[in-house]
Curated annotation (Swiss-Prot):
Pfam families linked to this entry: TGT
Pathway it works in: tRNA modification; tRNA-queuosine biosynthesis
Binding site for substrate: D96, S97, G98, G99, F100, D150, Q193, G220
Binding partners and assembly: Homodimer. Within each dimer, one monomer is responsible for RNA recognition and catalysis, while the other monomer binds to the replacement base PreQ1.
Stretches for region RNA binding: 251-257, 275-279
Record field: catalytic activity: 7-aminomethyl-7-carbaguanine + guanosine(34) in tRNA = 7-aminomethyl-7-carbaguanosine(34) in tRNA + guanine
Protein name (Swiss-Prot/TrEMBL): Queuine tRNA-ribosyltransferase
Glycosyltransferase found in the keyword field: yes
Any GO CC annotation of this UniProt entry: cytosol
Name of the gene encoding the protein in the UniProt record: tgt
Length: 380
């Protein structure tokens, strides 16, 4: 049996769904699942210190290979002692492959069998990223969990294009495995692609499962498709993945999508959503989204969320936070970011308890009704 640096332990499966309660063991510690992972694009979760992230309960954070490769450089980070030491974070870190950023940020990209040539979005210089280079960068960063280099086709691309794309992604995954210098202390995940085509998702999953990765990611979702389309893809994709390994849904952070992903057997999620919307004054609360910048909160001396026990809600009022944001004070963004991150990490804590209690569907319905989705009659 292969001795993986990343191990998944299943504790319980919810009676009425495919939801899994478990934990993932890494070289930098163990975290419970299902788990939402805050995104630290530039080796920092925007405005939050490592101590604050630990107080929130973030058992693992994500950093972006593409951005750190361009600035300050993966070799510099390696010389500093690796990403954990560089950013003073002693818990697990996951890095993406850089692929999504190449396709979404870079200009004039050209995809070939060898890799992707593109223009650096910072200075316009010509860059080349291959499966081997993506692995080399992540080996230098020293993350606990790494991603294979993949192509992330748009959800509505033609069938023939997506078929060629997933076949190339499978070949790239094999090349990445061979290039991996640190399989003893960094777990490399394969990424299942295939847009909305069930047979292509099956083909992609079969290819990657045969390569025996320590874990598997589901990519190519949350890229413009409907919530129902995402759920349909998860319905036929997660059962294709090994039960004894982690399952990671990339780029998903809306509360309803988190719960619906868990119902379909997903263990890990990440998204920039909580910090991105926080910078505009949008806060997630138990009763839905609240835009605290709005004038009606100018004299509202209550917390952002009456049911939240985070640092922000225990100490500051809507009126004060609105004042900070209107005055362009960074502390306001710190407070809203802290609250939103806490909200999603704590939501996953409640979801884990609901799995333990075998009442996840009831929890979902109650949450959606309170949050204001009015979607409690969705098909599961």
């Amino acid at each position: 049996m292969t001795d993986y640096p990343i191990k998944y332990r299943l504790i319980k499966t919810e009676k009425h769904t495919g939801a899994r309660l478990g934990e993932i063991i890494t070289p930098h510690g163990t975290f419970p699942t299902p788990m939402f992972m805050p995104v630290g694009t530039q080796a920092t979760v925007k405005t939050q210190s490592p101590e604050e992230l630990k107080a929130i309960g973030s058992g693992i954070i994500l950093s972006n290979t593409y951005h750190l490769w361009l600035r300050p450089g993966d070799e510099l980070i390696a010389r500093s002692g690796g990403l954990h030491k560089f950013m003073n974070w002693d818990q697990p870190i996951l890095t993406d492959s850089g692929g999504f950023q190449v396709y979404s940020l870079a200009d004039s990209r050209n995809i070939t069998e060898e890799g992707v040539t593109f223009k650096n979005h910072l200075n316009g210089s010509k860059m080349f990223l291959s499966p081997e280079k993506a692995i080399s960068i992540q080996n230098n960063l020293g993350s606990d969990i790494m991603m294979s280099f993949d192509e992330c086709p748009q959800f509505y691309q033609p069938y023939d294009y997506v078929k060629k794309s997933i076949e190339r992604t499978s070949r790239w995954a094999e090349r990445g495995l061979k290039a991996h210098r640190r399989p003893h202390d960094q777990g490399l995940f394969g990424i299942v692609q295939g847009a909305g085509f069930e047979d292509l998702r099956r083909q992609s999953a079969a290819d990657l499962v045969a390569m025996d990765f320590p874990g598997y990611s589901i990519g190519g979702l949350a890229v413009g498709e409907s919530h129902e389309e995402m759920n349909a893809v998860l319905d036929f994709t997660t059962p294709l993945l090994p039960e004894n390994k982690p399952r990671y849904l990339m780029g998903v952070g809306a509360p309803d999508s988190l719960i619906d992903g868990v119902i379909r057997g997903v263990d890990m999620f990440d998204c920039v959503l909580p910090t991105r919307i926080a910078r505009n004054g949008t806060c997630m609360t138990s009763e839905g989204r609240l835009v605290v910048k709005n004038a009606k909160f100018a004299e509202d001396f209550t917390p952002l969320d009456h049911d939240c026990d985070c640092y922000t809600c225990q100490n500051y009022s809507r009126a004060y936070i609105r004042h900070l944001l209107k005055a362009d004070e960074t502390f306001g963004i710190r407070l809203t970011s802290y609250h939103n991150l806490y909200f999603l990490v704590n939501l996953m804590k409640k979801v884990r308890q609901a799995i333990m209690d075998d009442n996840l569907l009831e929890f979902r319905q109650d949450f959606l009704e309170r949050y204001g989705y009015n979607k409690s009659n969705r098909n599961f």
